[in-house]
């Protein structure tokens, strides 16, 4: 009888080509699957909740894999310990559970939260530099917060979806888009039912234009209306972005019960 193991994973994406396997570059998926093969003696495919891009980090990526009965795969806690003992320092298994066949890390998800960190310093502090973007110009955070509220709700986010991908629909719902300022760091908190390719980084890029005074906050309404990514600003760099957590419906709330119960999508 096969089992399905679910992992909660944190990683620093700096040295990786993203989550998904790439033939000529090292990915998070490849590192995990290589170590699982070393433990099990055969290839195990790991499926994530979504593909983070090169340089993007994660605090709460969720992934699952199937494996047949095997002495090393009977206890999720033991699996977590074995993986952490073999993984490099920039990938950590935060938790592991065993679940039923109905669960899927991608298709069972009901919400995701991304966080993008900005430094207000012209040169970020050394321990922040790999995890934040410093625009190096003065930002009006209040105007950015005002603008952000125009994107909350259900909209066609075609203007915020990078070209070169085909989408069955570009309509998404943002439950939260807030800016939290603490000392010299600003965190853009973006929670929604799903995200298009580079959507969060494109939203942050648009907010930066508002923050530096290039456009008024209402400009985001015009961007939504155009449905044309080519008229939008450049994407914010990847290294400021982190997948913070992924939420699932009952009974799959192992890793985010608190966040789910307090989220606006549950109201």
From Swiss-Prot:
Domain of life, source organism: Bacteria
Membrane-crossing residue ranges in chain numbering: none
BP-aspect Gene Ontology terms: tRNA pseudouridine synthesis
Active-site residues (renumbered): 53 (nucleophile)
Cited InterPro entries: PsdUridine_synth_cat_dom_sf, PsdUridine_synth_TruA, PsdUridine_synth_TruA_a/b_dom, PsdUridine_synth_TruA_C, TruA/RsuA/RluB/E/F_N
Keyword Amino-acid biosynthesis: no
Keyword annotations from UniProtKB, A to Z: Isomerase, tRNA processing
Reactions catalysed, as given in the entry: uridine(38/39/40) in tRNA = pseudouridine(38/39/40) in tRNA
CDD domains: PseudoU_synth_EcTruA
Binding site for substrate: 114
Known role: Formation of pseudouridine at positions 38, 39 and 40 in the anticodon stem and loop of transfer RNAs.
Subunit record text: Homodimer.
Name of this chain's protein: tRNA pseudouridine synthase A
Organism per entry: Chlamydia trachomatis serovar D (strain ATCC VR-885 / DSM 19411 / UW-3/Cx)
Gene assigned in the entry: truA
